[in-house]
């Protein structure tokens, strides 16, 4: 409930304060990113209160990407805030985060659903909660940040399919069905409450029908689109 309430309060400007001036400024100054993560950092800090991995009640591992090597980097100790900012540093949108001599960006660049990392850490059963994709969108996003997010969403669905196919013989993998059809852009925060309601209702029904215990075929949300003529 606390997490849902946090999401309901968020507006796009709280996370992506993108304006015409910020885009022009990035070009004039030759920056490699459009937005400073100041507001995102404030949200994380006010929510986590300077939490450290070592003090958490449950083990947590955050995956980022080394921007120079392209390899996934699993962060499991130290400051959670820095790890999350690194893991969500969408290339071009946010700057890379420097940590222990490495430049880190969004984990989705190397592995959006880090099944491989979970297997390497010893997981025997993996439950994937995919964010889904805007499969009913009628036209592509018109600004750079929204387009970057949309493309990464497409990539994550493809990679999820490959990862499940590769690792399902080694560990038990369950993919919770995402919302479909979905027309909202990942850059659109105006529909958050409605999406939370739909997702909760659908997931409760899925759990009630034995979704977690089902031995049937895995539900993998492949990249797709609902075409309208």
Predicted regions and their residues:
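Patatin-like phospholipase
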Residues: 1-229
